[in-house]
Design a protein with these regions (language model features):
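Post-signal peptide N-terminal segment of mature Sec-exported envelope proteins
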Residues: 29-68, 76
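C-terminal motif of bacterial Sec signal peptides marking the signal peptidase cleavage site
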Residues: 17-19
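N-terminal binding-site loop/beta-alpha segment at the start of enzyme catalytic domains
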Residues: 56, 61-149, 267-268
């Protein structure tokens, strides 16, 4: 009996020593192993990414000229919502328009807008305020509110400079104080505009402009003429666009090229805002959502797939126009507002 107990204890000791030896021989985890495990755990699944990217367009970021896509970190940075351009970059859906602002007003309003949350600023050579826009952006950067890559800046080459487009584009960048301009547009059709568009395409290759487009071109024929002038498809067409002129036919046509319609005068423009703000349909929908008429109109714009750039020198209005990301219009409301389109343009540019 004693001998049996002795053998049993001996066997148990052998098993215990074997287990300890096996545990000691296992390779310890290196810091790299630990980091790899943490990385695999922290990366969201594809399904999670799709759920969290609801503000982003599903359009692939393939540049229209066939070159490599823009850096991914540049493409997903606008918390207020953005759209994918066919250039491979992303563009915020709401911005500040600066038409009629002086340099001093532009500096003040751009700074305030960026502080409020805007990440898209629209200017033009014709406005005469590129220096002010640049100063406002620089103040925001110097104050640590944003980095340069956080803000999308648009300018436009004016007809008077169509004879020397390369120098004109460089001069805009200089006045803005920028190494590159996010989007450069031809301001309107005119003599030599096809050559100007070729210069814009060249500016993309030079790296001084990232995306290009056209402004105040309202028909598919006009678009095709400009598109065929160079090897880069326009990323944006910026036109008059509001309740009573919604560019629906052009917008539908441009979809095949992943070209986005951007709206100047999205609230109707000077002398016409009151009529649109007092529209019975807009007033009723605004009361339902506890929002103002301009907020309903701007919400409709971005929810329809447009980019809107309302302009103002009033800080309260700038802040009000930005406050449109905490609600959505229903499908029925969207259809009601769509039905308000009368095909009426207020300007003849």
């Amino acid at each position: 009996m004693i001998r049996q107990l002795f053998y049993l204890v001996l066997i148990l000791c052998v098993f215990a020593l074997t287990a300890c030896s096996s545990h000691e021989q296992a390779e310890p985890k290196t810091p790299a192993d630990t980091q790899s495990e943490q990385t695999q755990t922290s990366h969201p699944t594809e399904e999670t990414e799709n759920q969290t990217d609801t503000n982003h367009s599903n359009t692939e970021n393939t540049p229209s000229d066939g070159s490599e896509s823009a850096p991914q970190e540049d493409n997903m940075k606008y918390a207020i919502g953005d759209v994918a351009l066919n250039s491979g970059y992303r563009m915020p859906v709401l911005g500040l328009g600066t038409w009629t602002l002086s340099d001093d007003e532009a500096e003040d309003c751009v700074y305030f807008a960026i502080k409020t949350g805007y990440r898209l600023i629209d200017t033009a050579q014709y406005y005469g305020n590129e220096k002010g826009v640049g100063k406002g952006l620089k103040r925001a950067i110097d104050d640590g509110i944003v980095k340069r890559e956080d803000v999308f800046v648009t300018s436009k080459i004016m007809p008077g400079n169509y004879s020397s487009p390369d120098d004109s584009i460089d001069e805009s960048a200089k006045k803005l104080g920028l190494d590159y301009i996010d989007l450069m547009l031809i301001h309107q059709s005119g003599a030599h505009d096809e050559q100007v568009y070729q210069a814009l395409a060249k500016a993309v290759k030079r790296g001084i402009v990232r995306s290009i487009g056209i402004s105040n071109y309202y028909t598919s024929n006009e678009f095709e003429r400009m598109k065929n002038a160079a090897d880069i498809v326009p990323a944006v067409v910026q036109n008059e666009n509001h309740l009573y002129y919604q560019n629906t036919d052009l917008k539908a046509y441009l979809k095949q090229y992943n070209t986005v319609v951007e709206s100047w005068y999205p609230l109707g423009g000077r002398g016409h805002t009151k009529e649109q703000f007092q529209n019975e349909t807009i007033v009723r929908i605004a009361e339902k959502h506890h929002k103002t008429a301009p907020q309903i109109i701007l919400r409709y714009q971005i929810q329809s797939g447009y980019i809107a750039i309302p302009g103002s020198s009033n800080h309260d209005h700038i802040a009000e126009n930005y406050d449109i990301f905490d609600f959505e219009l229903t499908d029925d409301e969207m259809q009601e507002i769509l039905n308000l389109d009368k095909g009426i343009r207020y300007e003849n540019w």
